[in-house]
Amino acid sequence: GGARVLFLPQKPYIPIGTLRDAVKYPDEKSTASDADVVAALEAARLGALAARLNEVAHWAYVLSGGEQQRLAVARALIFKPDWLFLDEATASLDEPTEAAIYSELKRRLPNTTVVSIGHRPSLRQWHDREVEFQREPGAVGRLIEAKAAGSA
């Protein structure tokens, strides 16, 4: 098969059903155990939800925007994509939580290429390259290939 790709938008889709299924989405054939799901929730700073794996709910209405974004991160940790695209996927989080999330992604998905779209300068430290788009006549963008401090 081809590369495994996962896209996490600012407002992730969360299906109605059990919390377990919401975390495993979109991989219906996921063999992740409940322990794996709980570990992913804990890494995404949602450990308080661990006891609710069997609960059926419309999680998009139960969880706050930040919790939905963290659930999507737990999903990425379960899915283990080759390519992970984050489009403002941590915009609803405060900067310390965002840093903790990126640290977990880097630690738990060492072979995943992460492409982030965001506006916060704090995201720079988690990436090796930066493409900056500006509204200037004749210019689309410029590639900044400075090694971010502390990144691999």
Language model region names:
Residues A3, K11-P12, A48:
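Intrinsically disordered, acidic/Ser/Pro-rich low-complexity regions proximal to membranes
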Residues P15, G47, A91:
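Nucleotide phosphate-binding site architecture
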